[in-house]
Amino acid sequence: MTTRGQLFFGAGLVVAAAGLVLGLHDLTKIGVLLILLPWLTLLLTRRDLDLEVSRSVEPERVPMNAHADVTVRVRNTGRLSTPVVRGEETLAPALGDRPHLLIPRLEGGESRQLTYRVRSHGRGRHPIGPLTLRVADPFGLATRVVAVPGQSSLVVLPRVLPLAAVRGVAAGGGGDSAASSRVALHGEDDAAVREYRIGDDLRRVHWRSTARTGQTMVRQDEQPTRRRALVLLDDREVAHAGTGDAGSFEWSVTAAASVVTLLLGERFDVHLSPASRESGVLLPVESLDHALDELAAVSLHPTSSLQGLVEALEEFTRHGGGLVIGVFGELEEQIADLCTARSRRGLALVIDREAFTVGGRDRGGAEDTVNRLTTGGWRAEVVRPGSSLPQVWAHLSLGLGVTR
């Protein structure tokens, strides 16, 4: 019941009481009507609305700060007509303000389409929906809020910056034999495996990898020797500071997306491994869309361990190795393991967390990490607020055979 309905009810009590005291029956009837009217309208708004809501998003994947059109289709699945109702779409904050929709009266079986536009302000897989309806009577005495189930999503891809192209890296990481470079990360007895797709020949199922991953894996046809690369992303919450686009984590995701895009364009076989990923079999990046979708959904995790990254690097090195690029926070006890497991070509972008912290004091942790990584055979650079990824990459990759 709205405030207006409560006022009607209160006024009805006063008028009815006055009518009884004064012996004015007509006044008493008016008071009773004022008392009953809010309750009658409340009952009317409690009637179920047989509405079905579906929506489509075009396009379903957009870059940062791009627009997407959302079409909402509302259908009356009942036999009775529905009243005019106001609706509000539930949106993630990164997609802007919630749009308000006016849904007209719908006869039984009738449907209407309504369209609105959203703009992507932040990376991620953002839900759209459900639709919240506000059902009210014509007098505004009662109202009811109903959420109609059903959701869609919009994938906002990370930024990708152009980087200098990699040249002169041999298959398998420079100097490795063609045979070893073809060894898959899933085991030395198979050329390569991937997840099962509908239509694959069941005779190609690789049972050992299936048992290890818990998912059906099949052998791929042997591919020509290609250069291989592993991109490591430190997604530990303790490794980053700042929020939004100005935060260190978004800088790291942009770096990972840009590096993966570069490597795939240079026809590398790329593997991507965040710190939060469970250790075990490393799955290859099947396409650029696959990599960007994964990086769009990545988020900070409360884990404080880099064991997942260390195991990924050890697995990669054990089965042929190749070019390794890491986007790390400050590293401490994990350094020894990481350097021991290193590939012959390791590049590291090290986030200076204190520099991204408002009022933070420089403890030299990032510099210490760079020094220890360099001692272990890596090339490493410190990343601070305002660091240009293309410039950092160009400086970091000097001597690796990079053309600009």
Can you name each region flagged by the protein language model?
Residues 26-27, 36-283, 323:
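An amphipathic, basic-hydrophobic helix/alpha-beta surface used to engage anionic
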Residues 1-48:
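A eukaryote-biased signal for short, well-structured alpha-helical docking elements
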